[in-house]
UniProtKB/Swiss-Prot annotation:
Cell division inhibitor that blocks the formation of polar Z ring septums. Rapidly oscillates between the poles of the cell to destabilize FtsZ filaments that have formed before they mature into polar Z rings. Prevents FtsZ polymerization. GO terms for biological process: cell morphogenesis; division septum assembly; regulation of cell division; regulation of cell septum assembly. PANTHER family: SEPTUM SITE-DETERMINING PROTEIN MINC. The gene is minC. It holds the Pfam family MinC_N. Belongs to the MinC family. Interacts with MinD and FtsZ. Keywords: Cell cycle, Cell division, Septation. This is Probable septum site-determining protein MinC.
Amino acid sequence: MIHAPIDFKGSNFTLLVIHIYDAPIEVIIQAIQDKITQAPQLLKNAPVILNVASLSPECNWINLLKAILSTGLHVVAVSGCNNSTLKNDIIISGLPLITEGQTLQCSSYTTTPIKSTLSINNKTKLIHTPIRSGQQIYAKNSDLVITNNVSAGAELIADGNIHIYGMMRGRALAGASGDSHCQIFCSYLFPELVSIAGQYWIDDQIPAELLGKAGRIYLHCDALSIQPLIF
């Protein structure tokens, strides 16, 4: 049987969305570089989407894009553009325009999570094997339970809650569809990043006294909070 040379298939990827606001280019670039310095494992050479909803149509898009690319980030698409002039500039630069509805699976730097019409059901994705560096596990419309260790460089994503009953050294993103009621439960906290509905902490934002201990991470008043747990 002869196979076709290509095949189109749907898949899910987690991308960071950077919301660009009106500011001098050098200020924007410095802010991006500061973020990369804070979380190099997550952001260095990372693929990102730029949201330009708050960007002035009078901006010099080509110069701004060149400056952003100079930081090492790889811009894969642009969202939030409602101005015809800016749209034309973006198209000329060779980047695709996408709508917010297409970016619901993306983690975001905004303080307001994207709201989704998806409802989390009672299904649970259960994994007993170790999660290795470079692996990505996605629990669509469900909770995710890991009963083993998660290595640095691994990524856990769930539209529901995430439970890790092992050493957690990777990234955990709960409420990936925008559900702010989701939580992360972990037996041994050493994560590179934790996120709930787009709100995130990198490793050095987690209280030092809770590292290596059990904790529950949740959203309170649109900000991440952590509560020690005793098993």
